[in-house]
């Protein structure tokens, strides 16, 4: 393994380290380029990963719970929503490791197994999410455009089988990540060769271009079908239109930049015919953009719950019910706390303290007049 000279972001000195990438295990060349700076993207990566982790964990927990309730009621679409939420939840749970790694100047100190597992979860999550977005769009397309024909044919068992196939297929494709042998760095790039170029072409075509075409086509047909419907109000049609547009926009924003960088690198390798100096120059110029765009794909973990669960009627009703229950519980808690506080204040008042101490009261014979001076509250 050739050492790589990395610019130290704090003192500007070059530090020799050994660099690997999760796809190094594919039998690809481990030769690297020099003078790749990690400091340029450090702040952006730390901020984005921290924000996605903070927002994504509770959002996907709520999404998974709401989707599970719908699955138990026989909702087919909810199967894909549940799998997507669980996948995103697993990934967002690993983001703190990314933050530690980046803050440590891309030096992995948590052990080789942790690097392998984190890399495996990350790259699997990208394409599992993309495929589940396709499944969700296709299921909505069938349910809306072919509402009568699909009645009784959309089954929960079929959705579970498709979900299992997605997990197995993506898991097998990325399994070679576990054969990585390097120990000091993780997730970083290698110099291009013909096999990596082919891998990038495949990822762009199968992992992005085809799914994007499916999502764009299905949502366009959904919108057109709803537009021609006479049974929906203008507000309902606008809601469906905005939802369809949002799906495509989020997909493009999260996944298009990174896959376009992959395509540029693969095309440049083909154009320069593998010239090492030309490719190293390209790697050094595109490295910061590449890792930032890769980081941008994690925003999908926050966007998916908003689009596919919180925007649906059933989910909004469930969220409203949970919020109402939480509000009632909070009000009861506030009343209890206020009552307890008021009782405490009364116990601390002079009159209350006097009442709580035992004093012998004067005994008046029957029929005798009351004393002239007494507390108003005291009776004869």
Curated annotation (Swiss-Prot):
GO biological process terms held by the UniProt record: G1/S transition of mitotic cell cycle; negative regulation of G2/M transition of mitotic cell cycle
Disulfide links within the chain: 115-186
Q: Which CDD domains match?
A: 7tmA_GPR132_G2A
Return the InterPro entries for the record: G2A_lysphc_rcpt, GPCR_Rhodpsn, GPCR_Rhodpsn_7TM
Record-linked PROSITE patterns:
G_PROTEIN_RECEP_F1_1, G_PROTEIN_RECEP_F1_2
Q: What induces it?
A: By stress and DNA-damaging agents.
Q: According to its UniProt record, in which tissues is this protein expressed?
A: Highly expressed in macrophages and hematopoietic tissues rich in lymphocytes, like spleen and thymus. Weakly expressed in heart and lung. In atherosclerotic plaques, expression is observed around the lipid core and at the shoulder region.
Q: What does this protein do?
A: May be a receptor for oxidized free fatty acids derived from linoleic and arachidonic acids such as 9-hydroxyoctadecadienoic acid (9-HODE). Activates a G alpha protein, most likely G alpha(q). May be involved in apoptosis. Functions at the G2/M checkpoint to delay mitosis. May function as a sensor that monitors the oxidative states and mediates appropriate cellular responses such as secretion of paracrine signals and attenuation of proliferation. May mediate ths accumulation of intracellular inositol phosphates at acidic pH through proton-sensing activity.
Q: Per its record, how is this protein called by name?
A: Probable G-protein coupled receptor 132
Organism whose genome encodes this protein = Homo sapiens (Human)
Q: What is the lineage of its organism?
A: Eukaryota, Metazoa, Chordata, Craniata, Vertebrata
